[in-house]
Curated annotation (Swiss-Prot):
Name used for this protein in its record: Lymna-DF-amide 3
Subcellular localization(s) per the UniProt record: Secreted
This protein's GO CC annotations: extracellular region
Keywords annotated in UniProt: Amidation, Neuropeptide, Secreted
GO biological process, one term: neuropeptide signaling pathway
Positions of modified residues (Phenylalanine amide): 13
Main location, first listed in the record: secreted
Length: 13
């Protein structure tokens, strides 16, 4: 999904 924190796709792990 889209990462609303980093603003990139699949960055929020």
């Amino acid at each position: 999904p889209y990462d609303r924190i980093s603003g990139s796709a699949f960055s929020d792990f």
